[in-house]
């Protein structure tokens, strides 16, 4: 099988988790119809898959992490904005529906988020790489590399985090 198709197949779960998380904000506020939500979700999945297709490295999950990061920080992430335009949501409406500060990391085998600059990092989705007898050592390496990925992104902060707690959210 061609390496790209293998990589693309591995990002389906991660993208679905990220899109579901963002869509829940729209659903919770009740300002969009179910059909609009489906269109938004499908559009965002397609946009993310296209955006990530040359920046997805299951063998090195941290590689490309900054590129794949979805960020709302008083500016709307452009991919979320494009998906919202397809259902007729204005930027102002979108800002009312989503947190003003949101970071969503979409990495191979893990999707995590932080709301607010000083919020805790929460894990939305976790998967193990397909492997044989070395699975336990692979998982240990992955945990270390996931944390270092996020630490690298947090290094540019202007204020230190009040809390840096990892917690798993199961759905």
UniProtKB/Swiss-Prot annotation:
Subunit structure comment from the entry: Interacts with CNOT7 and CNOT8.
Function: Anti-proliferative protein.
MF terms (GO), sorted A to Z: enzyme binding; kinase binding; transcription coregulator activity
Location of Phosphoserine modifications: 159
Source lineage: Eukaryota, Metazoa, Chordata, Craniata, Vertebrata
InterPro entries in the record: Anti_prolifrtn, BTG, BTG-like_sf
UniProt KW Oxidoreductase keyword: no
SMART domains: btg1
Pfam families in UniProt: BTG (PF07742)
Implicated disorder: A chromosomal aberration involving BTG1 may be a cause of a form of B-cell chronic lymphocytic leukemia. Translocation t(8;12)(q24;q22) with MYC.
Entry similarity comment: Belongs to the BTG family.
Keywords: Chromosomal rearrangement, Phosphoprotein, Proto-oncogene
Protein's name according to its UniProt entry: Protein BTG1
Protein's GO biological process: cell migration; cell population proliferation; negative regulation of cell growth; negative regulation of cell population proliferation; positive regulation of angiogenesis; positive regulation of endothelial cell differentiation; positive regulation of fibroblast apoptotic process; positive regulation of myoblast differentiation
GO annotations of cellular component type: cytoplasm; nucleoplasm; nucleus
Domain of life of the source: Eukaryota
Gene: BTG1
């Amino acid at each position: 099988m061609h390496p790209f198709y293998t990589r693309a197949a591995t990002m389906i779960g991660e993208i679905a988790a990220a899109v579901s998380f963002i869509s829940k904000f729209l659903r919770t506020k009740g300002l969009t119809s179910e059909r609009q939500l489906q269109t938004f979700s499908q559009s965002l999945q397609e946009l993310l898959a296209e955006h990530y297709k040359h920046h997805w490295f299951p063998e090195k999950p941290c590689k490309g992490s900054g590129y794949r990061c979805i960020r709302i920080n008083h500016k709307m992430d452009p991919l979320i904005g494009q998906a919202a335009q397809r259902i007729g949501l204005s930027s102002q409406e979108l800002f009312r529906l989503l947190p003003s500060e949101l970071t969503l990391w979409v990495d191979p085998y893990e999707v995590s988020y932080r709301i607010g600059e000083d919020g805790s990092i929460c894990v939305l989705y976790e998967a193990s790489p397909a492997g044989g007898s070395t699975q336990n050592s692979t998982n240990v390496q992955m945990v270390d590399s996931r944390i270092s990925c996020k630490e690298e992104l947090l290094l540019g902060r202007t204020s230190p985090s009040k809390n840096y707690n990892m917690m798993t959210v199961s759905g």
